[in-house]
Amino acid sequence: MDNHVVIMAGGIGSRFWPMSTPECPKQFIDVMGCGRSLIQLTADRFDGVCPRENMWVVTSEKYIDIVREQLPEIPESNILAEPCARNTAPCIAFACWKIKKKHPNANVVVTPSDALVIDTGEFRRVVEKALRFTDDSSAIVTIGIRPTRAETGYGYIVAADQLQTDKEIFTVDAFKEKPDKETAEKYLLEGNYFWNAGIFVWNVRTITSVMRVYAPGIAQIFDRIFPDFYTEKENESIKKLFPTCESISIDYAVMEKAQEIYVLPASFGWSDLGTWGALRGLLPQDKSGNAMVGTDIRLYESKNCIVHTSEEKRVVIQGLDGYIIAEKDDTLLICKLEEEQRIKEFSK
């Protein structure tokens, strides 16, 4: 199989301000304090699934240098610069049409750059199973995460019929928007609702033909760009035509409309790390429930906090319960965890 991985890395991670900024968003930051940024961890978990020369990154023009620095093994021609943000459907089309130019039978995994996976061995097993399923078929597979709680922050995939040929794979009945708490609790009890991780697997022939049916405007634009890939005209063509794409997610453009959509439910310790609270739940905690990333953090009479600081700063905290304390460069945030939905407001 000619396997390829497309890493989507154009977001700005505004909910993780001040650690994540428009100049250096969270996918390029060592969020976990492990010595690797989230995009580096994303690439690492696909080692063994495909070689680095078959990995692709789609990102904003202003992050190209950061990607080159953090992922030097990925060829420069595989780092694709979006002239402007147009959501995930044009982002994915950009990568898949370019891959198809030199790899017409490529099997592709599309993944966000800023999620966390704990069990990388199980992750690879699941992804490789999906790749085998899509290699010689017109199927699209999405990885569904088995829910561990009634989560209101994720969209859901509803599984329908189990395949007779592979008991791990199901047809998809529907995609659901982020639910309220009562609905999320119902989903958890139903047993056939899975978190939408935004990880998709398909053959490049399949996605290009499906987009011609369900997202013809975007497909036509990339059909026009296609002859210019790998030529001196490529950058000019992208800058001229990419901004004319409709701004739409791959879920709305394709996944909710196409016919042969399947879900492969999985459990590999996935989190999209969308909030400070989610990060606190994944980091090691002291006996008082405090999670810390930094080299010199001292807490006194404090509990249930998350502290994230740059390496050279000494931080001393006394008497706080349930707070975010985050410092980067010349900015310090001190905010109640229960009020973290207001961080976008604070960062303006």
Which residues are covered by each model-predicted region?
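Conserved N-terminal catalytic core of the sugar/cofactor nucleotidyltransferase
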Residues: 1-7, 15-22, 33-112, 118-128
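Short beta-strand segments
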Residues: 7-9, 58, 109-112, 142-146, ...
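Residue-level signal for inorganic ion chemistry
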Residues: 39, 95, 114, 157, ...
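Conserved core of the sugar-phosphate nucleotidyltransferase
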Residues: 120-242, 262, 312, 336
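Left-handed beta-helix
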Residues: 204-348
